[in-house]
Swiss-Prot record:
Pfam families: dNK (PF01712). It comes from Homo sapiens (Human). Phosphorylated and activated in vitro upon phosphorylation at Ser-74 by CSNK1D/CK1. The lineage of its organism: Eukaryota, Metazoa, Chordata, Craniata, Vertebrata. GO terms for biological process: dAMP salvage; nucleoside phosphate biosynthetic process; pyrimidine nucleotide metabolic process. The keyword Transmembrane helix does not apply. Belongs to the DCK/DGK family. This is Deoxycytidine kinase.
């Protein structure tokens, strides 16, 4: 993928809160293209920053290449909880979903004190949100009987408490939904070759796709967060490979941001 030069950001409408950081979540199915897309956005504008999914934490990768991926005791001493979840979901789904959400909250909170503090028109793109953690992935695992009733009740209670403590800082100004068919996502899973994902069946992706569509396209999925019903959503069709043909998608993002 060609590296686009960084340049000045588009002119946005002045916010009544001055330089308050606009927070946008990039949502979509597994392998829809979120990582590729946020990396494109990060390179386009000095006032744009991204918070990638902390996959390294989940896979126990000993890497300090990313500012959001510094090692923790749980990462140094733990196993590959992503792989454990895929291999034995009935045993590890609750553990994985709890840790995935915890590591996401930690990374996203840390980013708020980063370089965007001094930006003129700061925009922070999250690769997924605490809401998809619960209402897409954890919910699907519960409905698939990979979490029992007690685990699901504890998870929801824990998620509510964590959001009561930290959620206001992470409330979204907008959502960008990268829409791709389950078949496209399955093909991209194969192409990117992440070992933990190679056994994912099409049926699993179809269930996640249905939940994404209900939440972000039809807006029929109910949550405990009333404000989400009013959050603007931009849907982008990413069934075609966009790594080297992203200009039209970026223009839609700029137009979307100008309305927030």
């Amino acid at each position: 993928m060609a590296t686009p030069p960084k340049r000045s950001c588009p002119s946005f409408s002045a916010s009544s809160e001055g330089t308050r950081i606009k927070k946008i979540s990039i949502e979509g199915n597994i392998a829809a293209g979120k990582s590729t897309f946020v990396n494109i956005l990060k390179q386009l504008c000095e006032d744009w920053e991204v918070v990638p999914e902390p996959v390294a934490r989940w896979c126990n990768v000993q890497s300090t290449q990313d500012e959001f991926e510094e090692l923790t005791m749980s990462q140094k001493n733990g196993g590959n909880v992503l792989q454990m979840m895929y291999e034995k979901p009935e045993r590890w789904s609750f553990t994985f979903q709890t840790y995935a959400c915890l590591s996401r909250i930690r990374a996203q909170l840390a980013s708020l004190n980063g370089k965007l503090k001094d930006a003129e028109k700061p925009v922070l793109f999250f690769e997924r949100s605490v809401y998809s953690d619960r209402y897409i992935f954890a919910s699907n695992l519960y409905e698939s009987e990979c979490m029992n009733e007690t685990e699901w009740t504890i998870y929801q209670d824990w998620h509510d408490w964590m959001n009561n403590q930290f959620g206001q800082s992470l409330e979204l100004d907008g959502i960008i939904y990268l829409q791709a068919t389950p078949e496209t996502c399955l093909h991209r899973i194969y192409l990117r070759g992440r070992n933990e994902e190679q056994g994912i069946p099409l049926e699993y992706l179809e269930k996640l796709h249905y939940k994404h569509e209900s939440w972000l396209l039809h807006r029929t999925l109910k949550t405990n967060f009333d404000y989400l019903q009013e959050v603007p959503i931009l849907t982008l069709d990413v069934n075609e490979d966009f790594k080297d043909k992203y200009e039209s998608l970026v223009e839609k993002v700029k137009e979307f941001l100008s309305t927030l």
